[in-house]
Amino acid sequence: MLVGCLGGNLENDISYPGDVMYESTNATIVEVWEDGAVVETTYPVLSFDFNESSAPSAFLSYTVRGTHVDETVDASQTTVVNVEFKHHGFHTLELIADYEDTTDERGDDSRHLNEIVVRIEKRIEWRESSTNEPMPMTLDSRHEVGDRPPSVLVLASTVHNPALIANLGGGQEVEVLWELIDNTQEACQFQPGTVKDGESASWNTVHFNTDEVHDLRVTYEEGQDTIDVDHTVDIQYEALETVPTA
């Protein structure tokens, strides 16, 4: 973590935005899909409290700034900057506290500046109900900010074969095949399974070739019972974020 100041001659007892309090420097975006369409996206919000910062004159504003975020608050109204994150990856953020010029500021901007790193991951929840032709789930796990790709994809998939309510002809087993398809249209991982009537079967795996697009596919023979499909995919990064201060 880098600590410093821009402009002015500050005394040694002046606090920098290194005194900014933040309880967390990592969070997760959650995206929910139903029957092939996004129905909800929850973006995490992290808070940065400049209450412990001090300067030779009154603060004017507090700012948290990065490639995809830029939030400023009036220092006379609050010391807390709430930042919403919409991109997964490593965000390098500047914590800026601007204060009034004093007679010894030499005409420069008066501010304290600190830099931290925040890790934002992503979870995708996918559900299809009563389908006899499951759709491929496209997974674009390429990092959206920063220079480092995700460290791993964690996949958990469950196929449920609902029991027939009106048991006229009886339910049947369903033979399924899970495949993780890479950008060459080859299956880099796969798993066959059998789902009995009224039961479920799951495939859990991890994948480390993360900086490309994949399809997660579930296929089964035509004429079998309709099925429900649930996927959960976590796009995870190595824990390289700045340590929280609160």
Where are these regions (language model features)?
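Non-catalytic extracellular/lumenal accessory regions of secreted precursors
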Residues: 102-143, 188, 236-246
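Residue-level recognition of secondary-structure-to-loop junctions
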Residues: 81-87
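C-terminal edge strands of extracellular/lumenal beta-sandwich accessory domains
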Residues: 101, 170-184, 207-246
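Acidic, Ser/Thr
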Residues: 45-57, 158-160
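Short beta-strand segments within Ig-like beta-sandwich modules, predominantly Fibronectin type-III
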Residues: 69-77
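Hydrophobic/tyrosine-rich beta-strand signature of extracellular beta-sandwich/beta-rich modules
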Residues: 93-97
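Acidic, Ser/Thr/Pro-rich low-complexity intrinsically disordered segments
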Residues: 133-196
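Secretory targeting signatures
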Residues: 1-22
